[in-house]
Amino acid sequence: MKFSELWLREWVNPAIDSDALANQITMAGLEVDGVEPVAGSFHGVVVGEVVECAQHPNADKLRVTKVNVGGDRLLDIVCGAPNCRQGLRVAVATIGAVLPGDFKIKAAKLRGEPSEGMLCSFSELGISDDHNGIIELPADAPIGTDIREYLKLDDNTIEISVTPNRADCLGIIGVARDVAVLNQLPLVEPEIVPVGATIDDTLPITVEAPEACPRYLGRVVKGINVKAPTPLWMKEKLRRCGIRSIDAVVDVTNYVLLELGQPMHAFDKDRIEGGIVVRMAKEGETLVLLDGTEAKLNADTLVIADHNKALAMGGIFGGEHSGVNDETQNVLLECAFFSPLSITGRARRHGLHTDASHRYERGVDPALQYKAMERATRLLIDICGGEAGPVIDITNEATLPKRATITLRRSKLDRLIGHHIADEQVTDILRRLGCEVTEGKDEWQAVAPSWRFDMEIEEDLVEEVARVYGYNNIPDEPVQASLIMGTHREADLSLKRVKTLLNDKGYQEVITYSFVDPKVQQMIHPGVEALLLPSPISVEMSAMRLSLWTGLLATVVYNQNRQQNRVRIFESGLRFVPDTQAPLGIRQDLMLAGVICGNRYEEHWNLAKETVDFYDLKGDLESVLDLTGKLNEVEFRAEANPALHPGQSAAIYLKGERIGFVGVVHPELERKLDLNGRTLVFELEWNKLADRVVPQAREISRFPANRRDIAVVVAENVPAADILSECKKVGVNQVVGVNLFDVYRGKGVAEGYKSLAISLILQDTSRTLEEEEIAATVAKCVEALKERFQASLRD
């Protein structure tokens, strides 16, 4: 919103300069976006009168004038403006004057005729872009007066950003109220003398939508001169607020809008058939707007109609068929309170955003309509003449907004502000804000003023008291609290440490939605019931996730569709599993999951182009598990999972309890999700891993290690992990390392069997092992494998 600083100072004039005023307004919560002078920098321009005006003898478009500027003689000035005429009061730049752009006025000859100055237009003085003619001043403008003084051009336009909750500041009166409160000054409102009815003319008014229009005032004014010029003082105030003068009737309604914040509209009374009906539009009803466009109305749009047709969109835009024109003699002034909910969104639906809709959407003072009607009537009659009829008031008290009664407690005020403000000061602030205040013991009862819709709860009053008291006046006090060192168990494994490891391995962390597409989730977890949202964002986001895989796989598809074929991502977050034994019937588990697909390495001339496989992901997962210190207790077991490839997946067990899965996505699921190529996933229940085993210091043997290799033939269904585990168990203290380095199937090995080549590392911490001891330990391992797995040594 833009307004003139001088106009504001007519209401309240604090003894501070423009910069301090702008800062004060900003600190009050109305952010000042800019302060600009209303005119360019110039001097030497005075009010003059054109005494004579004749045609230039040598130029058809020029005139030779004699101008009285209050000196001892008339000035000869050549002028090319089409509106220059005898008797006109004008702005005269005399010799020696300097206009904007450092343009100096000198004596000159134009087409042979002397010119001792210049008759100025608004654009030449940097006041506006209007360069259609010279400035026409009122006939009573005092000759010789400095034009800056006469037009009050030592003024600024202040532009503020008004937040949606402060609709009361969409008029000069609202800003003035705040400035008056902040400076503890009285508000000087212009005297609004009621205009008594001098005629009996009225129009019948019916309000069929009282919820949308709780109050509607109408008044007939007859015999106006719509062609009467708008006074220069009003034009200037409108211009400085960014509004162009149109005609006297429209200018008056715009003036009241800017001054009081109350939108108004004027209908041509003679074009209204029957009377006024305030109703909701009929489905498909049309209205030709003032700009000539046709709007197709919806049934939820409020309209002002006569007995035959819609005349205007209520609170938004007028209609062409009832608008004021050059032939208008009788008008109906409308001043109403429309409910914000009945206006919100309707203007945007038709590509409109008007000053009226901007205010009605945020809320207009429901007690303002009488004052605005009297103000507009007085201005209209003073400018255009005419006679006013009685004010017709249709009010539905039941649907008018009620003023909120709020209790402010001393304890709440002190706690939220952190500073004690004296009781009498709090009372004074609330009363200056317009509240009706009743003091109690350690509390205040405040009835909010009608113009403050945003005062509804106790915190609103706390904010107002702090704002008016001044945030800068509240002392800075450091927070004081006892500092207690938190206990930290060495066994606690931070999830951040795991994320860092995965980052180092080339994974990127992602965060996906907790609500997913139930159809996709059923593909991954067929037959498992999920928690459905009663009011989802969309059908595709209507179920709470049972695992992190749903979001991660969708992220892979998203990236593959954008030519990102090598993907390595992970996520930590909650899954939501229905469980009748859990609180509220839902169990929330913290999970860690990851996905890889594409090439094993980034593209490089010296690296083979190989696709990731099961063992790539299993290796990364083992690195994570190694951080827990429990890797030796983890087992990977072949176990079916409907989302995973039956031959390339495993369940992950810790001390006999399943804690997750790892494997290749099932080919059928891969096809349904449009995954491009082999995709591998893992998921772990993090809470079952977070309690790590603290590493224990062990003595490093100074004696040589010995390696012995054996190859055993076992049945195809015997897991290699069980073979390695048995060797570790049998070897006790001497076997310090067991590793599978080859798997063979083929010639020499019966069908249904496989050959596992295993290396045994033997070492003692106190002595060098003898060959006989080594051989005995190896034999013991072989014997144990024969007994448990029916293994045989391969020749």
UniProtKB/Swiss-Prot annotation:
One of its GO terms (cellular component) is phenylalanine-tRNA ligase complex. It is found in: Cytoplasm. Mg(2+) binds at D454, D460, E463, E464. Binds 2 magnesium ions per tetramer. Residues 401-476 form the B5 domain. GO terms for molecular function: ATP binding; magnesium ion binding; phenylalanine-tRNA ligase activity; tRNA binding. The keyword DNA damage does not apply. It is an enzyme of class 6 (ligase). It comes from the Bacteria. Tetramer of two alpha and two beta subunits. This is Phenylalanine--tRNA ligase beta subunit. It comes from Escherichia coli O157:H7.
